[in-house]
Design a protein with these regions (language model features):
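Charged, compositionally biased N-terminal leader segments and the immediate start
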Residues: 1-8
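Cofactor-binding active-site loop characterized by glycine-rich and histidine/acidic residues
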Residues: 21-24, 29-160
Length: 160
């Protein structure tokens, strides 16, 4: 990791927190065209994991994906445009806050449905393994996801 890691982490944490606080401020205006689920208080998980990943590594996330999207290098302007339902949004304004994606940054997507990105991540990781690529796939999910059948099925598949 780079020199001054603590300063880099702090700046990333601060930036993400400020963005989400601004979303909180703007949301009641009804200009944001999608429901939002914040990751305030959870920023450090995304920042820490993404700091250990390379630009070629990929992540999958949950509906609380703002921190992950930004920590992995997703474009802030594209993210905000997505929240506003604009064409220059990360998913052309069609997906909203809970379905952020930035393929160029390695942010493969988030989903509003609990645990659904887990099998996608496992399948992507298997493809990487079969192609003998030196890349990492990380998937983020909440504790509720571990109660879903797809979580257990994915863990069994990942063990192959």
């Amino acid at each position: 990791m780079a020199e001054h890691t603590d300063e880099i982490f702090y700046r990333s944490l601060y930036r993400i927190r400020r963005v989400e606080e601004e979303i909180v401020r703007l949301y009641p205006s009804d200009r944001i065209k999608s429901p939002v689920h914040l990751s305030i208080g959870q920023e450090s998980v995304s920042v820490g994991v993404c700091a250990a990943l390379s630009a070629n590594d990929i992540v999958f996330g949950t509906y609380r994906g703002h921190a992950l999207y930004l920590a992995k290098g997703g474009d802030l302007n594209s993210m905000m445009a997505e929240l506003y339902g604009k064409r220059d949004g990360s998913a052309r304004g069609k997906a909203g806050s809970m379905h952020l994606i930035d393929l160029g940054a390695g942010m493969m997507g988030t989903s509003a449905i609990v645990a659904t990105t887990i099998p996608h991540a496992v399948g992507y990781a298997l493809a990487i393994k079969m192609r003998r690529e030196n890349r990492i796939v990380a998937v983020f999910f909440g504790d509720g996801a571990s109660d879903e059948g797809v979580y257990h099925e994915s863990m069994n598949f990942a063990a192959l």
